[in-house]
UniProtKB/Swiss-Prot annotation:
UniProt xrefs under InterPro entries: HAD-like_hydrolase_phosphatase, HAD-like_sf, HAD_sf
Annotated family: Belongs to the CTO1 family.
Protein's UniProt name: Cold tolerance protein 1
Organism the protein comes from: Saccharomyces cerevisiae (strain ATCC 204508 / S288c)
SUPFAM superfamilies hit by this protein: HAD-like (SSF56784)
């Protein structure tokens, strides 16, 4: 059985949100560039309040009324409100990226400039979370075919350079990509965004498309696949809970306790006793918090090293 890894990028593979890092590039290349980045931060927050969701977001996601096993037949019904909430957030995100497009902040920046910038920012792999490279060499048998990135980041070129493995296919990176100038002779950005991947609902939709395409290929070859989706934030939760994946929420509670509690207790609804056990210094490195059809599950995992051990244990079952 092939193990397929589909991972978020920012704060899952990386230590920080690198969208903020990418935002520095236009101003490094042109220190006199206007408007300053604070303008776009304000635009985002203004849009967040202006387009605030007025519907019902049913939290926690795993309430007492949720069946113990998530399946293809009940997923859309169980998480209908969350799908609507995440889809509504497209309005907020579009308001923000449309302003960046309007101001042409990234227009004419070359792909080579982005690649060089990414390598400089990731000097000695400083952007990568501990254990990621070891995980890839130990778990991913064929990086060219078995590893995917699904992110709301802005640049395939940036993602590719930071991960740093030349075997990673460009076609296996899915993100809110900066568009390129249509002239094939010009390797630069035109200042616009793809805008297909902005929210958690976009992620789970594209995840389904990825799984369908891989399944089609595996069936032709007579193979079967085990899918793992790894993420760290609210935009990853629908993909983590998707019935076709073993889902992983990759957060170390010691490193980011407020984020951990918000997502695990308030949004997902994991029982406090399980959370307390996982939070402890001597607690487990990983913990299953829900079941899915076919023996799959969703897990809390503290690190890439712990995830390596979990996958190896699960694949031996």
């Amino acid at each position: 059985m092939k193990t397929i890894i589909i991972s978020d990028f920012d704060e899952t593979i990386t230590r920080v949100d690198t969208i903020c890092t990418i935002a520095k590039l236009p101003y490094l290349l042109n220190p006199r560039l206007k408007p300053e980045w604070g303008h776009f931060t304000k635009t985002y927050m203004d849009g967040y309040h202006k387009y605030k969701y007025n519907g019902t977001r049913s939290l926690p996601l795993l309430s007492s009324g949720v069946p113990t096993i998530i399946s293809q037949s009940n997923f859309n019904k169980l998480f209908a409100d969350e799908l609507k909430y995440q889809n509504h957030n497209r309005v907020v995100e579009l308001n923000s990226v449309n302003e960046i497009t309007k101001q042409q902040i990234f227009k004419s920046i070359s792909l080579d400039q982005m690649k060089t910038f990414a390598r400089d920012q990731n000097h000695e792999d400083c952007l990568l979370r501990d254990g990621f490279k070891t995980f890839c060499s130990s778990v991913v048998k064929n990086f060219e075919s078995d590893f995917y990135v699904l992110s709301i980041n802005w640049s395939k070129e940036f993602i590719h350079e930071v991960i740093g493995d030349r075997r990673l296919k460009n076609s296996h990176i899915f993100c809110n990509d900066l568009k390129k100038v249509s002239d094939k002779c010009s390797q630069s950005y035109n200042g616009e965004f793809d805008c297909r991947l902005l929210t958690g609902s976009d992620k789970v939709k594209i995840l389904g498309e990825i799984l369908d395409k891989i399944d089609s290929g595996c069936n032709k070859e007579g193979n079967s696949c085990s899918y793992w989706y790894i993420g760290d934030s609210e935009t990853d939760l629908l993909s983590i809970l998707h019935p076709s994946t073993n889902g992983v929420l990759l957060i170390n509670p010691q490193e980011n306790p407020s984020k951990f509690i918000k997502i695990t207790e308030k949004i997902i609804g994991i029982p406090k006793d399980k959370i307390s056990s996982f939070e402890a210094d001597n607690g487990p490195a990983w913990l299953q918090f829900c079941e899915k059809e076919g023996g799959k599950g969703a897990y809390l995992v503290k690190s890439w090293d712990s995830l390596k051990d979990l996958i190896m244990q699960v694949t031996k079952m």
